[in-house]
Amino acid sequence: IRNPSNSNLYGDWIKNVQGDVSFVTEFGFDWIPPPECSLVITHDTYRPESCAAIFNCIKKNVPVLILSDGILEYRNSWIQKHRVDSGIFNPILGHKLACIGASQVRFLESIKGYFGKCENVGLPRLDDFKIESSKSKIPSILVCSSKTPWFSDDDKNQILQSFIDLKEIACNYGQNHTVKFNWRISDHIASVIGVETSIRKSLKEDLQSSTAVISMPSTVMLEAMYTSMPVALLDYTLSPHYVQAAWTVSCKEQILSTINELFNPPIAKLFFQRTALADALQIKESASARMVRLVSKMVEISYRSRSLGKPLRFPHRIIGM
């Protein structure tokens, strides 16, 4: 069951799943899976209708696999008022959650009652994510906001100030250096600081013309790191970070030195970034292959439980870390 706007989560890997696959995009509170259903897969745990459908599956003893669609972000997880009480995996509604990396597994399983709920899969859509090196001779920093930059008035003021400061220093820097700053930010932020946003372009297109990235906490960080681009984290809110970066900007005074280093990154910080990426994103093997293996094992375990008339239980780790 899925929201069609997030169809990139259900990419080529779904074609490699054995058996018949049906997509359900319209459903209400009373939706239940058909009797022949072996597994329900969804990322949609943010709406009352989809949460009710998941609960119906659990009651019917139908296994449910939840897909994580990106990084955890502290304010989104713990401060935002969500439409449903469960918010962001609080609790994890399904039998298993396909996490994007080892650190996400650790953070979530540190919460009481979550141990054994998480599997380290990765992000299948990044399996073949490659960009061509920029052909431009002019170094360029891509500046990114998250899709929903703030969740309160305090947040809004701090985040707008961070982009106001960054725009000011970027303009001054550009007067003395042959560099470019591209802004992949929300329309509101773009209007406040007086720049054009590339938010409607594909991320791949923006990254192909970039040398480095400055981003709010966002999955964009991992996508840029995955291409070996130096990435700085912009966050004036001083929130805990579930994904680490080698460069962090938490006040105006840190911006200039960070820009200088992004254009000439120290090797030690690049090593740190590579290690942080490997912890935040499963990249040891194909995420698509791990997802298919997880799905197959869950179906197999479910079938065996039904055949033996036993309660549905899954091992703490199905595919290993």
Q: Over which residues does each language-model region extend?
A:
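Active-site and donor-binding regions of nucleotide-sugar-utilizing enzymes
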Residues: 1-128
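Conserved catalytic-core segment of nucleotide-activated headgroup transferases in glycan assembly
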Residues: 10, 125-188
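Active-site regions of enzymes building and remodeling cell-envelope glycoconjugates
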Residues: 16-22, 37-38, 62, 115-118, ...
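Short, polar loop motifs at secondary-structure junctions
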Residues: 27-29, 102-105, 183-188, 217-221, ...
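Donor nucleotide-activated moiety binding/catalytic core segment of transferases
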Residues: 32, 183-227
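Hydrophobic/aromatic beta-strand patches that form the interior of the parallel beta-sheet core
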Residues: 41, 65, 96-98, 119-121, ...
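Catalytic binding pocket for nucleotide-activated donors in carbohydrate/polymer assembly enzymes
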Residues: 112-115, 190-194, 219-283
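C-terminal amphipathic helix plus adjacent low-complexity
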Residues: 264-321
